[in-house]
Amino acid sequence: MSVSLSKGGNVSLSKAAPSMKNVLVGLGWDARSTDGQDFDLDASAFLLASNGKVRGDSDFIFYNNLTSSDGSVTHTGDNRTGEGDGDDESLKIKLDAVPSEVDKIIFVVTIHDAQARRQSFGQVSGAFIRLVNDDNQTEVARYDLTEDASTETAMLFGELYRHNGEWKFRAVGQGYAGGLASVCAQYGINAS
């Protein structure tokens, strides 16, 4: 049975799914209103060391870098419309392959060309992040984002992190007004 999380809530993967080795992180959303322009949201992952920064550019997984250099995290591809039910974009994580110096993997969704298109998360509804045991396709945890993020153009949906030798997942729901560039700058990537 899937654990439904509220903002800030967390779940121990070793308790919720003790045998899980491979995680599918599914992210979804719907464009509430548009002016006819494309509304392209992009999921990405950042593999963070204990200092809260990436170890290098290869720890930023997104549509132009689909797999981490160690193969532990893979982006399954860019969905440019967000149309339809279910996951709009997803990432796969091999928990046993994540390097020991990676303490946390954060999952961020950004709006492509948000400033030029005058788009924000205020025009997005039904946003969610879910963790699925990729070995048996059982949903382990889900967080439905409900906050009004009227000016934000990037959103940290959730994070996988190590705590006392086990993996946990936390629902975050933190918005950023500066889009992908501000998220990259915070975690040690030069996005220019």
From Swiss-Prot:
Pfam family, one: TerD
CDD domains assigned: TerD_like
PANTHER family, per database record: CAMP-BINDING PROTEIN 1-RELATED, GENERAL STRESS PROTEIN 16U
Gene3D superfamilies cross-referenced by the UniProt entry: sav2460 like domains (2.60.60.30)
InterPro entries found in the cross-reference section: Stress/Tellurium_Resist, TerD
Residues in the signal sequence: none
Source lineage: Bacteria, Pseudomonadati, Pseudomonadota, Gammaproteobacteria, Enterobacterales
Similarity-based family: Belongs to the CAPAB/TerDEXZ family.
GO biological process: response to tellurium ion
Record function comment: Not known; seems to contribute to the tellurium resistance (Ter) mechanism. Also involved in phage inhibition (Phi) and colicin resistance (PacB).
Protein name, UniProt field: Tellurium resistance protein TerD
Keyword field contains Cytoplasm: no
Entry keyword set: Plasmid, Tellurium resistance
